[in-house]
Amino acid sequence: MKKNLTMLILASSIASIGISSTVIAQENLPYQKPPQSILALADVERAPAVSMDSKKNVMLLTYRSTFKTLNELNQSEMRLGGLRINPVTNISSSVNYINNLKLRKVSDSVEQQVKGLPKDALITNLTWSPNEKKIAFTHTTSNAVELWVIDVASAQAKRLSTAKLNANLDNPFIWFKDSENLLVKVLPKNRPALLDSSKDLPTGAIISNADGSVSQNRTYPDLLKNRNDEINFENIASSELHKVNINGTSSLWKKADMYSGESFSPDGKLVMLTTIQKPFSYIVPVNRFPSKTIVTDLSGKPIKTVNEVPLTETMPKGFSATREGKRNMVWRADKPASLSYVVALDGGDPAKKVDYRDEVFSWDAPFDQAPKSLIKTAQRFSNIIWGNDKLAVITDSWYDTRNEKTYFFNPSNPAEKARLVFDRNSQDIYANPGRFETKRNQYDRRVLAIEDNKAYLIGAGHSKKGQFPFIDAMQIDSLEKTRLYQSTYTDKIENIQSIEDFAKGDVLVQIQSKNEYPNFFFRNIKNNQLNAITQFKNPYEGLKDVSKEVIKYTRKDGVQLSGTLYLPAGYDKSKKEKLPLLIWAYPAEFKDKDSAGQSTHNPNAFTAPSYGSFIYWATRGYAVLDDAAFPIIGEGNTEPNDNFVPQLVDNAEAAIDAVDALGYIDRKRVAVGGHSYGAFMTANLLTYSKLFACGIARSGAYNRTLTPFGFQREQRNYWEVPEVYTKMSPFMNADKMKTPILLVHGEADNNPGTFTLQTERYFQALKGLGAPARMVILPKESHGYAAKENILHLLWEQDQFLEKCLKK
C-alpha cells in the first residue's frame, strides 16, 4: 500500500452508533473531501502576513499557500539529535515556505510585486538589513538553499551567491552592521557523503550506561541512536562561515565547524560564535549537547572564549530547574560590546533552600577584566529589558507558586537596592499590568522606552467586563501610573502593537471584529484620529451569518467558566430547535480558583477557523462551543492533577448544562473533541462519564507510564504518584470505555510524549476490549497537520463520524 495515495484506517465494529455491524478491521481508502460548506471555508486563500521597517515607512507583504502538498511532506528526511532536516537541501523538513513577496509604502496602498523572484519560490529566513534598505532571504531549490537579497527601493530581487547554504541549524546568515555584507553558513567544500546504514550489518551492540546520577528526562523524539547517527549529525551540523557582499563577492571567513549561533555586538565590531561540541548524546536533543562560545573580531580572529557548556543529560526535577554554569548569554542592548549572562546560585535545583536563585553578570569587551555582578534574584530569572546606564527592568518567577516579580534596578550600581515594580500571579490576566514598551537606540537595538522620566506599558486589557487594551505611562521615580489611552470598542478588538511617536501620540494598532479581518491602523491617542494602513478582506464569508456569543457559566464548585458558542446561520433562538452540540477544549492547570475563572474569550475576535476547528460544523447544523474553559485547579500543596478526572467531568457537565439551559441543544447528542492534551482530555471524558455520545481525539497520549518523568504541567514522576498516572491514563482504563471514539494521529509525530505509538496501542486496547473505535493515521504528518490531502480527509472523517454519531 502506498501511503502517499491512501489512508490506513482501522476500526472495530461500531453498530451501536449506526454504522454497519460488519465493519472491516482495515480499509484502504483513497483521500476524501468534506462537504462543500466545510470545503469552501477550509480551502481559502490566505491574506498576506505583514512585516514593516522600524520607521513604519515600508511594508513587506508575504504570501503562503494555505496548505502544503503531500508531495512536500514526502521529501527526503533525516532525524538526528531532535532535528528533522532534508539531507538533500540542508534545511528543516518542516519549513512553511513563502511563495510570493510584495512591497508597498505604508503611506499609500500601491503594492509593488517584487521582481526577479525565483520561479516556484520557496522563501524563508526574511531579514531586513540594519539600514533597512535591503531584505535578505533564502530560497530552497531541489538540491540546495540559496542566498537572495531584495533592494527595497526598486523592489528588485537577485541571487547573491551560488554557494549551497547550511540551514540545518536555523537561519544560515546574519547581516554585518554595515548592511553591505552578510555572515553566511555554507556547506564545507569537501563535505563527506552522509552514511546510509540501513542495509549494513551491525558491528556491535549499542550500549548506554547509568552512573547513578538522577536524570529525569522527557521522552524526546528523533534522538541519535548509534555511531553512524553521530557521524551524520556532525556532517549536517558543520558549516564554513563566509563573508558575502551584496555585490555577490564572497570569501571564507572561518573554517568549518558546528556553528549553532552567531551574533554581532551592538556596535558591530565583534562577533559572538557558538559551536556544538562533543560528546553527543543518545538521550537528549541538540540543545543540550556541549557547546563553546567565543568572541572574535570582524576578521574572525578569536578574542576570548566566554563560555563552555558541558553535556547536560542530568537536570534537577521541576519546571523551575535549570542547568549550572553561565546561561542566557547575550549582548547587552544598551552597551556597544558587553555580554550579560545568568548563573544559578542553587545549582539549578528548585528543591534547595537558598536566599537567591540566580545572579546576573555583565562582562565588558575585551573581556580581560572579571565580569561584574549586577543583581541577584530571589526567584528564577525570566528576562531583562535593558534601558540606560541607570535603569533596567528584570523579572523573576517561580512555577510552583505562579508568582512573578518585576524590578527596576541600576546596572551601574549593584549596591543600589532594586525597586519592586510588580508582584503578581502570572496567571491573573485581569491584573496584568501589560508589557513595557521598547524603542530602538543608537545601536539599533530595542531598549526600554524612556520619555520625560516615564516608562510605558501596553496591556491587553482583559477584565470581567470585556477586553479594553490600554497604554499607561509610569513615573520611574514614584511608580505612579497614568492611563494615556484605553480602547472603548464594544463591537471590535483594538490590539495595540507599538508606540510610534511619543510626542505626537501616534500608535500602531490592529483592529478586528467577528467578520472584519484584522487590519493595521495608525491611531493618534491625542486627537483620536484613525488612519487605515491595510484593507485585507474576510476570506470566510460563509461564516458571516453564523451566530457567535461568549457564554459564561459556573462549575458546581463555584469556578467561573466560559466558551464561545456558535449557532448555525438562520437559527431561530426563540423556537429553540434542539441541535447536536460539539465541544472543543484543552485543559489548563491553575493554582487558584480566581485565576482559573478569568476569561480571555471575546465575541469580537475575528472568526477564522483553523484546520483543526469544530467551527466548520456550524454550517452543518451543529451548535459549537469552542475553546470551552477546562481548568484543573490544585490549591496550596495540592497539585492540579491530584483531582484531574473529577474536575474534567465537572467542566464538561457545566458546559453542557449551560448550553442546555439556553434551550438550544439535545443533551443526548453531544460530542467532545481535542488535539494533543485535548485528545487526552477527550479519552478521559469518554472513559469516566456518560455525558457524551462520542468523541474525537487527535494526536494524543493515552498511556502516562510511557511519559514517566512528567507530562504537560506535571512535575512529579510516575514512581512518586503512580495512582495519579494510572487514573489519568485512558489506556490503563480502556476496559471502562464504551463510547464511540475517532482516534487520529500523524504518522510521524515529533512532539515529546505523543508518539504515534500512543494512539496505535490505545486503539488496539479498545478493539481488544470491544469498544467502538476508529483510528486514522495521516501519512507523513507530524504533531500538527500540514498537507492539503490529509487535512481535507481529516475534515471528511470528522464529518462522517459526527453525522453517524449525532444525527442518525
Per-region residue spans from a language model:
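Beta-propeller folds
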Residues: L10-I14, G18, I24-P518, F522-Q529, ...
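Bacterial N-terminal signal peptides that target proteins for export
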Residues: M1-I9
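N-terminal cap/lid segment of alpha/beta-hydrolase-fold proteins
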Residues: T534-E577
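Secondary-structure transition/capping motifs at alpha-helix termini
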Residues: T296-K301, A365-D368, W398-T401, F409-E416, ...
